[in-house]
Amino acid sequence: ETNPDKAYAVNAVGTRNLAVMAQSIGAKLIHISTDDIFSGTEDHSYNEFDTPNPRNIYGKSKLAGEAYIQSFCSRYVILRSSWVYGIGQDFLNTVLSAVKDPSVNELTVSEYEYACPTSASELARIIEYFIKILEY
């Protein structure tokens, strides 16, 4: 949010460059996007048919990247993940560590944010699947 130009350079223009290059060599592009392309204001889980409505720079820049892929590349898969967790430091492990730490007396979290945590190993398995299939 503090550097929108950089966010767009990486998430939109950088993604456009990858899409153009993938198309030029006939490669399949597998893109990891985010659930931040949605507003988060609906009372249901989002799916690929819901209309994107990002509320922050990150989501807007990632959505712009998705649009570039759809415009410039004919073989692509867009995977939208949220709260990726696995071995190492990530949001979910940070919260779990804080909950287990007896020296932490208070933990403040949003009561309005809902997400579906994504296992890093499961995400890797899905990426491998899309690499191998020929339909995309």
Language model segments and positions:
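NAD(P)H-binding glycine-rich loop region in Rossmannoid oxidoreductase-like domains
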Residues: 1-10
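Short acidic donor-binding/metal-coordinating loop in glycosyltransferase active sites
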Residues: 4, 34, 81
